[in-house]
Amino acid sequence: MTNTIVISCLHNIAAILYCGQIQKLVVANAHYQVSDIYLGTVDKIFSGINAAFVDLGKNEYSGFIHISDTGPLKKKYYINNITNILTIRQKILVQIIKEPTLNKGPRLTANITLSGRYIVLMPFSQAICISRKIYDEDERHYLKALAILIKPPTMGLLFRPSAIGIDEEIILSELTNLKEQWYFIQKSAINNCAPVLLYKDEDIVKKVIRDFYDNNTKNIVIDSNLGLKQLNYYINTWQCNFSSTIPSLQLYSSNKCILDTFRINQAISRALIPKVDLILGGYMFIETLEAFTIIDVNSGSFNNSTSARETVLKTNCSAATEIAYQLKIRNIAGVIIIDFIDMESQRDQLQLLEHFDKELSLDDAKPQIVQLSELGLVELTRRRKGKSLYELVSNDSNYFHFFIQLEQLDSIKPSSYKSKRLSSSVKSWLFSEIDMINRVFFKKSNLYRLSNFYYARNLYIIYSDFTVNKNIQLAARYKLMYSLQNIQILPSTWYFNFLDIHTNNITNYLS
């Protein structure tokens, strides 16, 4: 389904486009991400739930490991109490299988795996596995026989769907690389003190080409010379299982940011706003809570049908199409509850569910409609595949900050600022790019605008006086949906030192 892949090595972001529309965003996570391998230390053990917390050496939540994921650590197969497996301050080799959420640490396993394009090496298993997506029985028998011949004696192999029709020498070469990678990880575990990160897949070019490049890819655009060289290498290495036509590879050289040219910035900005307008005139709200996500559909101004029943059905079907897209672009996972506009006709309900299921079938995260409840709510689940877009951009260490330099404020009562608003010139671009700000309570300001304002999490106020005035804090209260969460006041004398540290995060554009 892919037509174009856009990779920004400078921002560690990639987008998968189909017919010009962004279908998926890939954002490299600077913190925990799936497949990271750590040498951790056991921090706490909870025998009641047969689980433990593992310190991974970062100032965040510890990793969580359940007894079901401790297979290689068990001395005997029938051990069913985690206290017989782990002890406090014990060093263990673990891998992340689920990225952390806003209030939970990463899920860990001791069953380490190393993924390649065609095979997955399992150092602590001796199993031979063939992907369920390989349906041809002859191909399955062939791959199983090949695995028996090439498998290391103490390791296991899993063949991915991309292994179909691949020459044995190529698979052997990849197996050799994975084994060398594993030996390097083992050596690092011996030579380093726990807790420490041993392996991280930081190459966004490799990740995107390995996971998303296929026969339908026509164009690949990248904004880095080094990235283009890597791209050529991976394309030439893995081209054998695709058509003979190599896609067009383009180095992006325009002065304009690649994320703006392909409207990736705009897509991210819109995906962070709860309200989504529908093509036919309705709208919906998407609210993500800790336990589940709620989507509320409303007809709005749409009334172009011959009957109210037809209006409701068309609006709901339009919303179903948009919801399927929003789940992918926002990477929303877990339990999702949708409140469509009420429909009394069971025939209309069936038509809506059939249409919705068809739209969801295009999602590789395998959403499943559970039921239409008695209250008319559609319940579905979607498999978690990495962090949601909101969780990624809420991480201030990955993205930019937003700076406001205030002129000295007169000592006026804070209440007098409540009627003040941003100047029209400032408000025009703020509200056009990200419709999240309600009011800003200060008199005069100069705003140093970042190219990606919606990435901002922290607001730094540069005050021209040495005195930290409480009125400034009151004056700078923002009401945001998903952005600024911390306000910090810096005297102007600290400003220049701060700029030296964060130069790469600040643009020279003065609004």
From Swiss-Prot:
Domain of life: Eukaryota
GO biological process: mRNA processing; rRNA processing
GO cellular component, one term: chloroplast stroma
GO molecular function annotation: endonuclease activity; metal ion binding; RNA binding; RNA nuclease activity
Keyword RNA-binding: yes
InterPro entries cross-referenced by the UniProt entry: NA-bd_OB-fold (IPR012340), RNA-bd_AU-1/RNase_E/G (IPR019307), RNase_E/G (IPR004659), S1_domain (IPR003029)
Keyword tags: Chloroplast, Endonuclease, Hydrolase, Magnesium, Metal-binding, mRNA processing, Nuclease, Plastid, RNA-binding
Primary location group: plastid
Domain S1 motif stretches: 35-117
Pfam families, sorted: RNase_E_G
SUPFAM superfamilies (alphabetical): Nucleic acid-binding proteins
Compartments, as annotated in UniProt: Plastid, Chloroplast stroma
Note accompanying the cofactor annotation: Binds 1 Mg(2+) ion per subunit.
Cofactor(s) needed by this chain: Mg(2+)
E.C. no: 3.1.26.-
List of residues binding Mg(2+): 296, 339
Family note: Belongs to the RNase E/G family.
Function: Involved in intercistronic processing of primary transcripts from chloroplast operons. The endonucleolytic activity of the enzyme depends on the number of phosphates at the 5' end, is inhibited by structured RNA, and preferentially cleaves A/U-rich sequences.
Protein name, per record: Ribonuclease E/G-like protein
Species of the source: Porphyra purpurea (Red seaweed)
